[in-house]
C-alpha cells in the first residue's frame, strides 16, 4: 500500500484523496453508531412525517414504514460503503471505477458541486432562523437591531445569525471526520433527552389512544394503503440518496467492513425507532393539544412557557442541523471539489470553495422561490438512485468486490480506461433509469413510478448495468484482469 501511495502522490494526487493507511483507518463500530443520529432527527424530517398523515395512513402504519425504511437505508449505506471500507478510498475516486476517470466528473459534480453546496447554503439559512429564535428568547432587543437595515434582503439580526451559523458549519467541515465524531458523541445523548422528552410530554398531554387515532382535519383514512405504505418508505429512503452515494467518504476511515456495517446498521435502526415513535407522538400530540395541525418542531417549541426547555430544545435542533450539514453536504463537497483538480486542490481547499459558493448564491434569496428550488434539487437527488444502482452492480457483479486502484489513480491526461475516460454503458443505464424514476414529474401516466422513484432508479440501474456488462463484455483492462 505504501508503494502505491507514493506512486499516486508522484502522479499529483493530494493526501486527502489517497487510499487511507492502516493507522488512519481507525473508526470502530461505535463511531458509525453515533454518526447519523443528527441526520435523522432534524426539522425537515419531522415536517416530512407531518405530510405522511395527509396520505390517510394510520399512526401505526406510519411508524412501521419509518422503521422498515431504516433497513433499506442501512443496506444502501453499508453496501455502497463496502469499497471504501475495503480500500480506504473516498467516493470521488471510487466513482471513477463505475463511470470512468472523466465520466465520474458529471455525477460527482451533481453530488458535491451542485446539490451539496446548494443544500449546505439552504441548511445554513434554515439553521440561522432557529438561531435567531434562540437569541430572541434570551435577548428580545436583538431582533430589532439595525432597524430597517437590509443587505440583499437580509436584516442585520438575520445577517449576524446566518454568518455565525455559517462559520460554525464551515469549522466542522474543516475538521472533517475527526471533529464530526467528537461532535456527534456529544449530540447523541442530547437527542435522546430532547426528542424522547418531547414524545413523553406529548403522550402525557393527550394520551397514547388519541395519538394512535390521530388524523389531520379534513383527511380521511386511506382504504387501500399498501402502495401508500411503499410511498412513505420511498420518501424516507430518498432523503438518504445523496449520503448513500457518497458513503465511502466516511467508510474510508473504517477499521474494517464489519465495523462500518455493524455500526451503521445498529445506529440507523436505533435512530429510526426513536424517530418513528417521537415524530408521530410529537406531531400528533401537539396538533391535538393546540387544536391545530402543526408539523414543525420549532413552532411547537416556540409555544412552550419554559425558557430553559425551549432554549435547550432549539440548541439541540441547531446541533442536528450542523450534523446533517456536515455529513450530507460540506464533507462530500470538499472531497468532490478536490477530485475535480486532484493535482491542485486538497480537501480543505474544496471545503473553502464550497463554503464561499454557498454564500454567493444567497440562500435566503433562493428560499423566496422555494418550490422551484426544491423541484430542481429533487430532480438532481432523483439521479442518485440510478448512480447507486450502477455503483453497486459495478463493484459487486462486474468487479466481484475487487478494485484496480491504478484504474482510479491514473496519471494526468491518461484516459486509457473505457472510451476516452467515459463508461458509456454506465451513462446509458443511468439516463434510462432517471427517465423511468423521474418521468412522472412531467408525464402523468408515469406518476406512480415517480412516487417510488428511489426504488425504481436503483433496481432498474442495477439490473440493466449487470445484464449489459454480462452481454457486452468488459470495457477496460482493469475489469478484464479482476473479473476475468
Where do the model's predicted regions map?
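Hydrophobic alpha-helical segments and their helix-loop junctions in multi-pass secondary transporters
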Residues: 124, 128-137, 190-218, 239-240, ...
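Membrane-interface "cap" regions at the ends of multi-pass membrane proteins
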Residues: 1-60, 196, 205-209, 219-231, ...
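Membrane-water interface regions at transmembrane-helix termini and the short interhelical loops
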Residues: 54-56, 81-83, 98, 106-108, ...
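Selective recognition of specific alpha-helical transmembrane segments in multi-pass small-molecule
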Residues: 41-45, 68-76, 111-123, 189-204, ...
